[in-house]
Amino acid sequence: MSMPLGVSVNSHQSASQVEHIADRFSAAAKHYQEHNCLQRLSGASLLQGFVAKGAILDIGAGPGTDFANRAMGEEMRVYALDIALGMLQQLKTIYPEHQCVCGNAEQLPFVDRSIDCIYSNLALQWCHDFSAATSEMARVLKSGGEAHLSIVAAGSLAQLSNLGLRVNGFLSLESLQAAFDDTDWQFLDVKLMPMTVYFQDLKALLYSIKGVGASVQSSVQTVTSSESDAHFGKLRGRHDWQALQQRAEQFREAQGLPLTYQIAQFRVRRQGGSV
C-alpha cells in the first residue's frame, strides 16, 4: 500500500468551507492541548474496547494522538489524517513514527480496502456531508474492519444557548445513524452520552471552544479562533460582558461552570466477513 511518508496535501481540498475550517484549526494548533479536556474525556471512553492493530486511520488526529501511550510495532501503523496542516506539523514533531496526511474525511486519500481499523474522536461533526464520509470509510476499510467514532451531536452546549449565544448546529443521533448504508455497515454499538466539562470562569469556558477551532456567535459578532488573542470582554462591550458573566454564574456548580456535550458513539463493522 502506497502511503505518504511525511506531511502531504490532498489536492482535492479546494472548497472554501473546508479551507475555512482548516484555517481555524491550524490557528488553534499551538493552544489545542490547553483546551481539549472534552477530547481527552471522550477519547478515554472511545478507546475502551478498541483493538489497535494493522493499519489504523485516525481521522481528525489534531496535534496529538490518542494512541500515544500504546506500543508501536511493525504490526501497527497509525495514519494521522487532519484537514489542518498546522495540526499535523505539530503532531509530526512529537510523533515522528506516525504517517501524517493532510486530507478530508469526505475524500480520503487512501486506496480501497487498505485500512484495518478507523478511529475518530470528535472530528466528523465538521463534515459538510457526513454520508460522504461514511461512504469513504466503507471504501478504504477492509472487510470485517471496525470504525470507532465519537461525534458531537444535537443538544450540545445547552448552557451557551441559555446565555443567548448561538452555536454550531449538530446532527441528531438518528440523522448520523441514517448516514450509514446498511449494505456496507453492521452496527455493533450505538449510544448517545452526555459529557460535561467544567471551567473556572466564563472566559475559560469560551476559550475551550475557541481553542479547538470551533465558534460561537452572539447577537453582535462571531467569536472565532482567529481572534484568539482578543479579550472576550471587548467583543460585546464591557457592560454586556459583565452581564453575561453574571448570568453564567447562575449555572455554577461545585466543580465550576459546566458545559455539556451530547456525544454520539458508534462502533460499526465493515460488511463482508471478519478479520
UniProtKB/Swiss-Prot annotation:
It catalyses: malonyl-[ACP] + S-adenosyl-L-methionine = malonyl-[ACP] methyl ester + S-adenosyl-L-homocysteine. Its EC number is 2.1.1.197. Keywords: Biotin biosynthesis, Methyltransferase, S-adenosyl-L-methionine, Transferase. CDD domains: AdoMet_MTases. Pathway: Cofactor biosynthesis; biotin biosynthesis. One of its GO terms (biological process) is methylation. It comes from the Bacteria. InterPro entries: BioC, Methyltransf_11, SAM-dependent_MTases_sf. Gene3D superfamilies: Vaccinia Virus protein VP39. The keyword Ion transport does not apply. Converts the free carboxyl group of a malonyl-thioester to its methyl ester by transfer of a methyl group from S-adenosyl-L-methionine (SAM). It allows to synthesize pimeloyl-ACP via the fatty acid synthetic pathway. Belongs to the methyltransferase superfamily. This is Malonyl-[acyl-carrier protein] O-methyltransferase. The lineage of its organism: Bacteria, Pseudomonadati, Pseudomonadota, Gammaproteobacteria, Alteromonadales. The gene is bioC.
